[in-house]
Amino acid sequence: MPRAPSYLLLALALVPILTFLRTRRPKRSSKLPRATERVVILGASSGIGCTLAHQYARLGVRGICVVGRRVDKVAEVVQECEVEVGKSKEGKGAKTEILGVAGDFADPGDMVEVRRRVEEAWGGLDTLIVAAGVSALRPPMAVAGAPNSASGSVGKDAIQHVVEATSSAMRGNYVGPLVAAVTFIPLLQHTSPRPALLLLNSPAPTRAIYASTKAASLHLYQSIAIEHPKIAVSLVMPSTVEGDFRRGAVDAAIFGASSVDGADGMSAVREADPNKYGFKREVVAQRCVDAIERGEKNVFMPWAVGLGHLLYWVWPAFVERRASVKYNFRAS
């Protein structure tokens, strides 16, 4: 244990070296020109996924497939992307084709249909971005309706609430990324000279259901990176991001209340106002584009969060306290 701090210092010293080496890598677009790149964005009807669609439209890629569950929202994003294509400088994006497909990324039938549409339109796929997911804000005991229970007794119905919330979170945060990977990996491998797969993922402490389901998909894609080395897998993990992602939290539906306003008597969102202090969607989306371009594996936002993962091995109590402070969490 006494040697642990020296290992931490060594890791810190390596950060600038590794950063420099990363910037020396040849850019993906030097081998796969933007004008030939075919992109599918799952979860593109809102949030960061929508912003990513706008950014790729401005880059002038060959095609973008916008995928989301709501037909009206998908159609809206398609129109917005077409406007961005029209505004691109010197007609750079004039040939970009925008497809819109409504579907649930956890539904195999829906994803097979997306794949069929992409193959029919472009004959293959180069970039798959998994930006879809669901939110869950409460600790399990709060979901059970007994955040301050001192008796140690939680009833069957309360436990069932936790199971239902977890099942919904698993479907959106693990099954969806799994279905997407199984559906599109063969197409990526066989039709792209530089296949890339990006998972947008933010495991958050003090939110056990959300964090555990997000961690499951994170480890899934880390394993996929080993099993399919020809595909450049990027894992982008931003901290708090602006937007209304939390409003549809799966653990709020159980109580029939808003997860944001705490109408059920529990303050679900504890951290500072995400729309005031969180990352801007445009910043996160641009970082995703850069990660794919540079072939980066693990991207933490802010970068210091990555150091927190290292520090956790040598000083876990400190990291746990800081996580509690960030999310304004007090254990009962």
Regions found by a protein language model. Give the residues of each.
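Rossmann-fold cofactor-recognition segment
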Residues: 81-109
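Conserved mid-core segment of classical short-chain dehydrogenase/reductases
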Residues: 133-167
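Conserved glycine-rich cofactor-binding loop
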Residues: 45-46
